[in-house]
Amino acid sequence: MRVRKRKGAEEHLENHPEYVIMNPEDIKGHWKEVFGNDHPIHIEVGSGKGGFITGKALQNPEINYIGIDIQLSVLSYALDKVLESNAPNVKLLRVDGSSLTNYFENGEIDLLYLNFSDPWPKTKHEKRRLTYKDFLETYKQILPEHGEIHFKTDNRGLFEYSLASFSQFGMTLKQVWLDLHASDFEGNVMTEYEEKFSKKGQVIYRVEAFF
């Protein structure tokens, strides 16, 4: 999700250390201590403006959530959502999805979400797609054995690519939705993009896959 540069975004993040972890490399292996409990930890890579991660945190207080985004301004908007919700089970990180092993120990994360990732449609940009094999290798390291990825998108091309990428990597497709909003799936938390696209009548695709 690309947004205009937000004035004061960095200062805004720095002023809320209770939610924004500025030195995540120092916490590797100790995330349960940060949350102060032994609850499962779920992360969203590319958390955008925080609608999904905040909604999930409110929906599931027994689960800890970490929203990850590399864009400073975007993360500052996510912080607004977290502050508004007052959810105690959310943390935010400004890091790149390719470097997650620098911040999380093997098996430290219980589940990983990818929502409306940039499709990078050009073949020469394949390695930038968050479901490319190199990213999957990174995710596999921080997830437990048979750890799951839950992926949503409105982009059919990226969805088909991701299904193939998961399968070629040796993952198992647990369940696939070719029209999520027309299904009987319960508990769906929509992202900002999802709300926008669904109002236009666009189909939303979803898959749950595990290693």
From Swiss-Prot:
GO MF, one annotated term: tRNA (guanine(46)-N7)-methyltransferase activity
One GO CC term, this protein: tRNA methyltransferase complex
Enzyme Commission no: 2.1.1.33
Key word tRNA processing present: yes
UniProt pathway: tRNA modification; N(7)-methylguanine-tRNA biosynthesis
Residues annotated as binding substrate: 122, 154, 191-194
Keywords: Methyltransferase, S-adenosyl-L-methionine, Transferase, tRNA processing
Matches recorded under InterPro entries: SAM-dependent_MTases_sf, tRNA_(Gua-N-7)_MeTrfase_Trmb, tRNA_methyltr_TrmB_bact
Positions of the UniProt region annotated as Interaction with RNA: 124-129
Binding site for S-adenosyl-L-methionine: 44, 69, 96, 118
Catalytic activities: guanosine(46) in tRNA + S-adenosyl-L-methionine = N(7)-methylguanosine(46) in tRNA + S-adenosyl-L-homocysteine
Catalytic-site annotation from UniProt: 118
Gene3D superfamilies listed in its UniProt record: Vaccinia Virus protein VP39
Described function: Catalyzes the formation of N(7)-methylguanine at position 46 (m7G46) in tRNA.
Sequence similarity: Belongs to the class I-like SAM-binding methyltransferase superfamily. TrmB family.
Name of the protein this chain belongs to: tRNA (guanine-N(7)-)-methyltransferase
Gene source species: Streptococcus uberis (strain ATCC BAA-854 / 0140J)
Upper classification of the organism: Bacteria, Bacillati, Bacillota, Bacilli, Lactobacillales
